[in-house]
């Protein structure tokens, strides 16, 4: 039995001695006590021990705080170390780092473009200070059981509502009459951005006035308000008050105000504002004229639904008498026949994304396309995030021993999770820098592709930077959380043994993520192929007219003599085959239908809504239309002034099997005799069905002097040498037009312009599909590389046993092809459903053939095989001696 010192002495020592010195002091005293017991006996040794204990109660040993005491640091104390380790790991694994950072950078760049685009779309018209109280009046009208959704409303409606409805604070109207020839002392230009506006426009919309009095600017006679850029363009300065501009040769106007350029994020775009009250339509003030768009500024706190509820009173009080006066019918009879007249309000801030009506002041976007853009951007970011997760977990075997050593050294799981999250955040931060760089360099190309005017300053302002950092942090946590939890879960013994590899063939999370990535890629490929197929169908479909080799010369506001002489002189050129003067072309229909009745009928149920186009006798021949029955107009034949050529749709709706010689009449008494029927031709987008159209002669085509409504002269070339033909036309124009600018376009280009939105969608889909496939393939490339590295000893053994290179490549590839095949199976029905919905917007469309899905599938498999094979072949060609030398 060992002899021990006095317990009381030990307690006294523990009480006085500093904890960080106790072990050392007590150990020394116990050794000394054992020695003294042997030397002088137990009794004397105990007294000596007490003496030594009392002797150690000195200032150096008495209880006090340690100056070098080490305590377990908090997780946040290790941040610097974690980021340093993360940076070293990224530097040591340059291939892995490049794949993950580049993939994330692409995903972040696409998502940034998506956010910029969506934010820009939702910002439309919000710069107006009273935007939340401004509403536009929409019209829903049906005649002949054909509905018309218009952005315009009756000419007197705004003024009437302001007078009769106390909820309306102010009203203003805007109107557009096409292009105008504008001339100053220095230049003459045909301008498209001319709007007519009431003087109250400044009270409703936020227009920053640089010079002039906004309350009087449009109230003065022969006035014009111009923008800052127009002022510099025509006068070289913004000091343009009282300067003179001449519109259409003889309309002299004085500048009464200069305003700042209207922001691009406005559905109302104008360079010139002219007084609307001076127009003939405004002076006529007819309730049957839907020429202008009307905007209401409601009083604060007004419920727009309450205003809409009062529109029935407007219909009964004003519209019903107009119907009786001009159409010999009543509102009740119109509704009884199945037709309708309705008015509604749409908030100003919703017009750009939620309105697609006749008479829109500018082309609007669709909220469906905006959401689609946002969703695709999000999906591509998810593909990049899943890449990071896959590549990080695939490297688990390499990090396993590191995890094991850290756990043995005392690291907790929370500390390991924090370390791996730090690495993820650092990777994401580098990816953000690269992504922002991509946005900077690619923004001009994106603006061209998306028809936008986005600026890089929107990315780097303070609020955007904060959102970017917060978003990047979220993406970093999202991407790094699962790998961090997965890697930190390894048991030290298993981790140090390196037995943590999961084979790719197992249905692990990595397989599901690959399936998700390629499902989105296949979906985008199928969408791109089908959109491309529909666009090719539009370009190659027989339209009922020949759009090639036809040039359009804008002659609006030209005199009758000028137009007639110009056409006659141009036709002398051997480069020109034929020409026509017209107000309407198959790409610029008015879409406004008049009510026409067969023979002597007056019943609204038998009426036909038909457009009336004024043309000359050469119209049908110049546009290459096919005359199915009857004859064409004859130049100089006065009787043809009371005739009409209709299309097949009109003949069908009138119920005429043999329409030639039949008569039709319009409400009000105008009667025309049908002399011919042309084959149906498309005059609108293929989204719409072909409706009735009637071609009638203008008075000037017969040598009359009633004035003309012609805006264009179109010529068909005799030669393929377009430049020679255009030069000939331009020479003649300069001789006759007396200084007016020569502006032209091609009929084929005007036709293509109707599908610009679809063309942009096609291009965006192609870009998105390419980016999605690239990111997915980066991940697949990394996974196949890690798989080949982990199985190098297995490959070596197989080669020693006689396996061929082809067999090994097949072995390594098949496990990765399974998720791709599953992705094709999942994506195909989803793509079929989505594209069916999209194609429903077209009245004339392609069938979704099976080969489109087959091509998308084979393309995906081919790309995946090509990506995997690079690493598989490389691994299969390695000398087995190198892979087995450590065994």
Report the location of each language-model feature.
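Mid-to-C-terminal secondary-structure elements
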Residues: 198-210, 224-365, 565-757
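Negatively charged linear elements and acidic catalytic determinants
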Residues: 1-91, 881-885
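Hydrophobic alpha-helical transmembrane segments of multi-pass inner-membrane transport and secretion
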Residues: 76, 92-117, 365-401, 429, ...
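Alpha-helical transmembrane segments of integral membrane proteins
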Residues: 66-98, 359-362, 392-429, 440-560, ...
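Short juxtamembrane loops and helix-capping segments at transmembrane helix boundaries
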Residues: 122-131, 140-142, 270-281, 323, ...
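Hydrophobic, regular-secondary-structure patches
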Residues: 121, 135-193, 200, 232-237, ...
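Interfacial "coupling" helices/loops that link adjacent transmembrane helices in transporter permeases
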Residues: 384-426, 779-817, 871-874, 878-879
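Small-residue-rich transmembrane alpha-helices
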Residues: 113, 344, 425-492, 533, ...
């Amino acid at each position: 039995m060992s002899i021990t010192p006095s317990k009381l002495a030990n307690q006294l020592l523990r009480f006085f001695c500093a904890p960080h010195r106790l072990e050392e002091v007590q150990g020394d005293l116990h050794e000394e006590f054992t020695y003294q017991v042997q030397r002088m006996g137990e009794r004397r040794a105990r007294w000596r021990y007490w003496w030594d204990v009392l002797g150690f109660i000195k200032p150096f040993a008495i209880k006090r705080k340690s100056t070098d005491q080490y305590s377990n640091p908090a997780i946040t104390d290790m941040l610097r170390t974690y980021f340093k380790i993360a940076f070293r790991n990224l530097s040591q694994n340059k291939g892995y780092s490049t794949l993950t950072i580049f993939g994330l950078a692409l995903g972040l760049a696409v998502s940034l473009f998506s956010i910029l685009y969506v934010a820009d779309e939702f910002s439309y018209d919000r710069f107006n200070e009273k935007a939340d109280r401004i509403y536009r009046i929409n019209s829903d009208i049906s005649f002949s059981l054909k509905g018309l959704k218009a952005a315009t409303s009756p000419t007197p409606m705004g003024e009437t509502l302001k007078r009769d409805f106390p909820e309306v604070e102010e009203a203003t109207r805007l109107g557009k009459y096409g292009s105008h020839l504008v001339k100053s002392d220095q230049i003459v230009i045909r301008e498209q951005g001319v709007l007519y506006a009431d003087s109250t426009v400044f009270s409703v919309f936020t227009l920053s006035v640089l010079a002039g009095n906004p309350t009087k600017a449009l109230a003065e006679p022969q006035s014009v308000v111009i923008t800052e850029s127009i002022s510099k363009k025509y006068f070289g300065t913004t000091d343009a008050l009282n300067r003179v501009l001449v519109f259409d040769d003889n309309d002299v106007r004085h500048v009464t105000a200069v305003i700042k350029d209207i922001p691009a994020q406005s559905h109302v775009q104008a360079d010139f504002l002219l007084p609307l009250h001076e127009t003939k339509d405004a002076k006529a003030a007819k309730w049957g004229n839907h020429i202008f768009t009307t905007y209401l500024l409601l009083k604060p706190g007004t419920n727009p639904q309450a205003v809409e509820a009062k529109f029935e009173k407007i219909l009964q009080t004003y519209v019903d008498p107009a119907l009786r006066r001009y159409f010999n019918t009543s509102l009740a009879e119109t509704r009884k026949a199945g037709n309708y007249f309705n008015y509604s309000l749409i908030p100003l801030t919703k017009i750009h994304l939620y309105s697609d009506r006749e008479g829109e002041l500018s082309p609007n976007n669709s909220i469906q396309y905006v959401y689609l853009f946002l969703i695709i951007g999000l999906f591509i970011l998810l593909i990049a995030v899943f890449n990071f997760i896959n590549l990080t977990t695939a490297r688990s075997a390499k990090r396993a021993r590191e995890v094991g050593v850290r756990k043995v050294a005392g690291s907790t799981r929370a500390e390991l999770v924090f370390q791996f999250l730090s690495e993820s955040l650092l990777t994401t931060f580098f990816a953000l820098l690269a992504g922002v760089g991509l946005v900077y360099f690619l923004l001009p190309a994106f603006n061209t592709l998306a028809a936008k005017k986005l600026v890089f300053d929107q990315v780097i302002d303070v609020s955007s930077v904060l959102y970017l950092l917060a978003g990047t942090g979220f993406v970093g946590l999202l991407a790094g959380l699962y790998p961090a939890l997965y890697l930190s879960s390894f048991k030290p013994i298993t981790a140090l043994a390196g037995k943590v590899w999961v084979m790719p063939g197992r249905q692990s999370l990595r397989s599901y993520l690959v399936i998700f990535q390629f499902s989105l890629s296949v979906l985008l490929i199928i969408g791109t192929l089908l959109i491309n197929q529909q666009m090719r169908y539009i370009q190659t479909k027989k339209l009922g007219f020949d759009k090639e080799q036809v040039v359009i010369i804008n002659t609006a506001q030209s005199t009758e003599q000028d137009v007639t002489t110009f056409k006659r002189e141009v036709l002398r050129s051997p480069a020109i085959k034929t020409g026509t003067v017209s107000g309407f072309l198959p790409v610029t229909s008015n879409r406004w239908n008049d009510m026409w009745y067969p023979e002597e009928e007056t019943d609204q149920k038998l009426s036909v809504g038909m457009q009336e186009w004024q043309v000359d006798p050469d119209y049908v021949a110049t546009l290459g239309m096919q005359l199915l029955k009857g004859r064409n107009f004859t130049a100089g034949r006065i009787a043809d002034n009371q005739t009409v050529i209709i299309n097949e749709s009109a003949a069908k709706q009138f119920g005429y099997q043999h329409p030639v010689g039949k008569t039709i009449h319009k409400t009000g008494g105008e009667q025309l005799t049908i002399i011919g029927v042309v084959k149906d031709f498309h005059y609108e987008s293929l989204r719409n069905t072909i409706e009735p159209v009637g071609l009638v002669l203008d008075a000037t085509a017969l040598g009359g002097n009633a004035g003309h409504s012609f805006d264009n002269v179109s010529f068909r070339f005799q030669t393929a040498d377009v430049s020679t033909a255009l030069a000939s036309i331009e020479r003649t124009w300069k001789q006759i037009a007396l200084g007016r600018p020569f502006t032209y376009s091609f009929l084929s280009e005007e036709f293509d312009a109707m599908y610009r939105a679809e063309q942009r969608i096609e291009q965006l889909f192609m870009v998105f599909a390419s980016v999605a496939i690239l990111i997915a393939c980066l991940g697949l490339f990394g996974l196949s590389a890690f798989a080949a590295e982990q199985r190098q000893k297995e490959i070596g053994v197989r080669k020693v046993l006689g396996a061929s290179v082809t067999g090994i490549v097949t072995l390594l590839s098949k496990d990765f092809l399974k998720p791709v095949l599953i992705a094709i199976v999942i994506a195909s029905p989803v793509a079929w459903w989505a594209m069916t919905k999209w194609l429903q917007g077209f009245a004339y469309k392609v069938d979704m053939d099976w080969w489109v899905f087959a091509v998308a599938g084979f393309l995906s498999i081919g790309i995946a095989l090509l990506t995997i094979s690079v690493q598989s072949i490389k691994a299969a060609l390695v000398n087995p001696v190198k892979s087995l030398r450590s065994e």
